[in-house]
Swiss-Prot record:
This is Lipoprotein-releasing system transmembrane protein LolC. The chain crosses the membrane at residues 24-44, 273-293, 324-344, 378-398. The lineage of its organism: Bacteria, Pseudomonadati, Pseudomonadota, Betaproteobacteria, Neisseriales. Belongs to the ABC-4 integral membrane protein family. LolC/E subfamily. The gene is lolC. It is found in: Cell inner membrane.
Length: 415
């Protein structure tokens, strides 16, 4: 059962106000809270979805972990397998070498990350090997100096399958005329499409033996790219992968280290958006203060009568706290319902307006993806609801305290 104070507070909330402007202010404050909660849930859901989608795409094209020798203290990559074989959580390992290079064709020059791979093993650690627009890993034949390019890189160079491109390495040849760049022609035998803009526009792959020749490496030099059963557990797994005694000779890093700055930037942006959009709820709470102050002024006679009948100042305070708290509750509830529903369907809503207006709002060259993802996190929803209810409760304190100080004789003097 409701207490007397709660019953009166609810009656005041739903009763028709003599002051129409006060009713309008109350509705605006409730709508403002609902709008703020909705906006906060939708924005955080989109950022969660974006972060999750990008993480998934990166894990399809980037190694979950990498391991190699420091300063080439050992030249045989097979010795690295002793750290990964029969290790729970590691599904596959593939050798690789990697270095920077320039690719030139038809007057165009692009910087690339040149990767030497072992075709039979590379397929085990990446997801895009079966979805190549042209060619396949097995087309890389050692000694033939073949190359597979990202689709964006091939388009920028004007290169197609069967064309030859010139690879320029950072290390030059020393001649009597001075140091000249090392040049080598490679034949394009395939194209890779990962779906990640930066990768598709900078990746070039060749056979690991040809890469060693190109960069003048020992015939067995390579690191290992690892595929894990649970990529989210990569930091914990890599922390124990190398025995303490051998950490001076072997390095290991996981995907969170390689992409740390990017995900830290996204997380920082998420926090800032949370703070900024919380201010919308705070502004609505100030409106709630205004509506309650006006309610206290309108109900002076009622307060005086209740005090005369024996209601304590604390009881009067509770009446208006209940009125304000329920206003905040209704606004929060409406915001949560609208926010969750819109968060689940924001991708469809954006796609509808894109089709209606004939514009494309999400540029894959900037955001890696061409649609708006969303992931409603109920933990975020609960936190937002608690903050909204907390701000609404704080907003009731001043008007309620003012009401509790009403003197019956003064309030009834002019009635």
């Amino acid at each position: 059962m409701f207490s007397l104070e709660a019953w009166i507070g609810l009656r005041y909330l739903r009763a028709k106000k003599r002051n129409g402007f006060m009713s309008f202010i109350t509705m605006v404050s409730i709508a403002g809270i609902a709008l703020g909660v909705t906006a906060l849930i939708v924005v955080l859901s989109v950022m969660n979805g974006f972060q999750k989608e990008i993480r998934g795409q990166l894990l399809n094209v980037a190694p979950h972990a990498e391991i190699g020798y420091i300063d080439n203290t050992d030249t045989d990559w097979r010795n690295l397998l002793r750290f990964t074989e029969n290790r729970k959580g590691i599904l596959a390992a593939a050798p690789y070498v990697s270095n920077q290079a320039l690719l030139a064709n038809a007057g165009e020059i692009r910087g690339v990350q040149m990767r030497g791979i072992l075709p039979s093993e590379e397929r085990k650690v990446v997801e895009y090997g079966d979805k190549m627009p042209a060619g396949k890993f097995e087309d890389l034949i050692p000694g033939e100096f073949d190359i597979i390019l990202g689709v964006g890189l091939a388009e920028a160079l004007g290169a197609e399958v069967g064309n030859k491109v010139t690879v320029i390495t950072p290390e030059g040849n020393v001649t009597p005329a001075g140091v000249v760049p090392r040049l080598k022609q490679f034949t394009v035998v395939g194209l890779v499409k990962t779906g990640v803009y930066e990768v598709d526009n900078s990746l070039a792959m060749t056979h690991i033996q040809d890469a060693r020749v190109l960069y003048r490496l020992d015939k067995e030099v390579a690191g290992l790219r690892l595929k894990l059963a649970d990529p989210q557990n990569a930091p914990a797994l890599t922390a124990t992968l190398i025995p303490e005694a051998q950490r001076d000779a072997v390095w290991v890093r996981d995907w969170t280290y390689s992409n740390r700055s990017y995900f830290e930037a996204v997380e920082l942006e998420k926090r800032m958006m949370f703070i900024i959009l919380t201010l919308i709820i705070a502004v609505a709470a100030f409106n709630l203060v205004s509506s309650l102050v006006m309610a206290v002024t309108e109900k002076q006679a009622d307060i005086a009568i209740l005090r005369t009948l024996g209601l304590s100042p604390a009881g009067v305070m509770k009446i208006f706290m209940v009125q304000g708290a329920f206003s905040g509750f209704f606004g929060t509830l409406a915001g949560v319902v609208c926010g969750v529903l819109l968060g689940w369907n924001v991708g469809r809503v954006v796609a509808f307006f894109e089709n209606l207006l004939g514009v494309h709002l999400i540029n894959s060259q900037v955001y890696f993806i061409d649609y708006l993802p969303s992931d409603v996190d109920m933990g975020d929803v609960a936190l937002i609801a608690c903050i909204s209810l907390g701000l609404s409760f704080v907003a009731t304190l001043y008007p309620s305290r003012r009401a509790s100080k009403t003197q019956p004789a003064e309030a009834l003097r002019y009635e």
